[in-house]
């Protein structure tokens, strides 16, 4: 599969639901990370927001991927406190806006464009720079890796796996950083040695996307095999 690979709304929905489950599974860990440099509520806030987002999708299924991601973002802004709601919410809203009201099927390149737009939303909202010890430090390298892999004619599943690995590397790199944004920045040098919880959540987001793409690829392969005489 190349950049022309089709990506349906169902793949985006699976991504969101995967992310909600990963957040729920890691809720305590994320709050423990936040306890060291923040308010100790990042995990509970994100879990509440993603549960609300899934409930909103269940109540009124969006007609396309753009509307789906926008609904997730709007829900996060309205239900998640602190900086996480506006940042993750803006990211999803910008992603949805990038996809627009296109019909059910998109291309792999649209996924990369959506994540690039989401990164732009994070930059506009939070004004982070590389090395500030924020979600940017996991998201930016993930988007770069995704684009590079797709440019090399990789499948979406392969490209998102590369993005997942880059996000994890970026997440881990926040541990020795000095925080320069948000509540963690008030700690000064005491913020060094602690992983940024926002970056940890971004790594889960990209992991969820990689899993959704891999599942979709497996489903497509199975359907093709079944159709073979």
Residue ranges and their predicted role:
Residues 1-229:
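N-terminal loops that bind phosphate or other acidic moieties
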């Amino acid at each position: 599969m190349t950049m022309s690979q089709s990506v349906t709304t169902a793949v985006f929905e699976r991504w969101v639901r995967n992310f909600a489950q990963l957040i729920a599974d890691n809720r305590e860990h994320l709050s423990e990370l936040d306890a060291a440099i923040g308010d100790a509520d990042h995990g509970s806030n994100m879990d509440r927001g993603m549960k609300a987002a899934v409930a909103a999708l269940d109540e009124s299924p969006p007609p396309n991927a753009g509307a789906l991601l926008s609904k997730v973002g709007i829900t996060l802004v309205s239900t998640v406190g602190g900086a996480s709601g506006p940042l993750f919410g803006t990211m999803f809203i910008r992603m949805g806006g990038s996809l627009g009201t296109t019909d059910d099927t998109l291309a792999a390149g649209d996924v990369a464009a959506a994540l690039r737009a989401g990164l732009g939303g994070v930059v506009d909202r939070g004004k982070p720079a590389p090395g500030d010890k924020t979600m940017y430090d996991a998201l930016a390298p993930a988007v770069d890796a995704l684009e590079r892999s797709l440019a090399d004619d990789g499948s979406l599943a392969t490209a998102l796996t590369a993005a997942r690995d880059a996000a994890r590397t970026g997440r881990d790199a926040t541990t020795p950083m000095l925080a320069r944004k948000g509540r963690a920045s008030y700690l000064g040098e005491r913020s060094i040695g602690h992983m940024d919880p926002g970056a940890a959540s971004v790594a889960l987001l990209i992991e969820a996307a990689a899993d959704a793409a891999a599942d979709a690829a497996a489903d497509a392969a199975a359907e093709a095999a079944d159709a073979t005489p």
